[in-house]
Design a protein with these regions (language model features):
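A charged, well-structured terminal subsegment
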Residues: 166-199
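Short acidic, Gly/Ser-rich segments with clustered Asp/Glu that frequently serve as metal-coordination loops
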Residues: 31-36
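Active-site-proximal loop->helix
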Residues: 76-77, 98-102, 149-163
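Short gly/pro/ser/thr-enriched loop/turn and capping motifs at secondary-structure boundaries
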Residues: 92-93, 122, 145-150, 174-175
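Active-site alpha/beta core segments
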Residues: 37-38, 44-127, 195
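A short glycine-rich beta-strand->turn/loop micro-motif centered on a GG-aromatic cluster
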Residues: 114-117, 136-150
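A glycine-rich helix N-cap at a beta->alpha junction
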Residues: 84-93, 159-171
Length: 205
């Protein structure tokens, strides 16, 4: 990065996700990998919900693929929702050019990253640590992350929390992106919230 950003600090500070300076990063939802992921159907469904909400709200979506020649591309439904997809060999996508993609057209870094992906304890973990080192406020959507075992998922989320990432649910992200039930796109996002929720009435519905 050419523009210095302040070091990331733990998310104990009272920051909400900034919907006007945010990008969604979806890490390595590759079709050859997903069948081995614990809860893989729910993991992919939550990632699709994130991507659909981001598209409705006009947020950029960046996908990554680890060694796509070996593991294949991301699942088609997710790949087609991404504005761009970064092929990489490092487990940390920041080492293969992700930081260059986290900028506005005039080159200004977008300060907030919402991230989810697989595997939680490998590429998702290392990419998030790279973002934190680079100074990005980073939120990890835990239910949309997956590992082959639940234990590795839990350990990854615990470590990321200790490292300064914000750990959030799907609904936390969507409602912080919206901020108010008077948002002009609230009614467009509401069906996505209801589709992934237990059927309760969403705030402001």
């Amino acid at each position: 990065m050419t523009d210095a950003m302040p070091p990331a600090t733990p998310h104990a500070r009272p920051h909400a996700i900034n919907p006007t300076g945010c990008v969604l990063v979806l890490v390595d939802y590759q079709h050859r990998l997903m069948p081995a992921i614990d809860r893989h159907a729910d993991v992919v469904a939550d990632a699709l919900c994130l991507a659909d909400a981001a598209r409705v709200l006009g947020l950029r979506i960046i996908g990554t693929e680890q060694n796509p020649q070996g593991l294949g591309p991301n699942v088609a439904e997710l790949r087609e929702r991404c504005d761009t997809t970064l092929a990489k060999m490092h487990f940390d996508a920041c080492a293969d050019g992700l930081l260059d993609l986290l900028r506005t057209p005039n080159g200004t870094p977008l300060p907030d990253v919402v991230i989810a992906g697989c595997e939680a304890h490998v590429c998702l973990l290392q990419t998030t640590l790279g973002l934190l080192r680079a100074g990005y406020r980073t939120w990890v959507v835990a239910p949309a992350c997956g590992s082959r075992t639940a234990a590795n998922h839990t350990l990854a989320i615990d470590r990321l929390r200790q490292s300064g990432a914000g750990i959030v649910s799907l609904e936390m992200v969507l409602f912080e992106w919206l901020q108010t039930c008077r948002h002009e796109r609230f009614r467009a996002v509401l069906p996505l919230i209801k589709a992934r929720g237990p059927g309760q009435v969403a705030p402001g519905a």
